[in-house]
A protein has these predicted regions:
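Phosphate-binding glycine-rich loop
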Residues: 23, 28-72, 86-88, 96-98, ...
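A short beta-strand submotif of the Rossmann-like class I SAM-dependent methyltransferase core
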Residues: 48, 75, 121-124
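Conserved coil-to-alpha-helix start sites within the AMP-binding
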Residues: 78-84
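Structured binding elements
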Residues: 91
Length: 183
């Protein structure tokens, strides 16, 4: 679908970096980008990893550390496979909750009906540039002591109550894969 979004100038900058650098991970450019990204989002910290899938896995590893090694994670039935694979691969059970047609996100009512004593977190995927949050979802997560994890890979720049998505939950994931759009 996208075959011409990497310009010749982009390729030249990348080639220059590869030819003149001896450090390809966790170098000064990564730190510079983490700082710029944090400033743009309006948050204190950002941690860059190699992919949105890895970011999903990191959020589940953190969930396991904070909430224990077993339990349920509320997830939507649509999104990217890594949202579900990260849940399963860290020992949790995904609980699928249907999305609404307004913003293609799981709704407060469906989340509320799915919460059990074993629920540890909610993975809210913001799809296709939409914001999937509501104050009711934020309040429910706090009331039930659930982690709210925002997958923002498809909705960079979307807002809720004048704040960028990805800043209202406990953790968030973004992806800069070339096929994702920046809203």
């Amino acid at each position: 679908l996208i075959n011409d979004n990497i310009s010749q100038k982009d390729k030249e900058v990348l080639a220059d970096f590869i030819l003149n650098s001896n450090r390809f991970t966790n170098g000064p450019k990564v730190k510079e980008f983490e700082s710029a990204w944090s400033n743009w989002l309006g948050v204190k910290y950002s941690v860059m990893v190699n992919s949105g899938a890895s970011a999903n896995y990191v959020t589940m590893a953190v969930t396991r550390e904070l909430k224990g090694h077993h339990g349920e994670i509320i997830v939507p039935p649509i999104g990217w496979v890594s949202d579900i694979a990260s849940v399963i691969n860290t020992g949790f059970t995904p609980v699928f909750v249907d999305v609404n047609m307004k913003n293609i996100a799981i709704s407060y009512e469906n989340i509320k009906n799915a919460v059990t004593k074993d629920t540890k977190a909610i993975v809210l995927v913001h799809c296709l540039g939409f914001n999937g949050l509501s104050q009711k979802i934020i309040d429910l997560a706090k009331e039930k002591d659930l982690l709210l994890i925002e997958d923002c890979c498809e909705s960079h720049g979307a807002t809720f109550d004048s704040k960028k998505i990805g800043t209202l939950g406990n953790m968030s994931c973004f992806s800069f894969y070339f096929g994702h759009h920046i809203t």
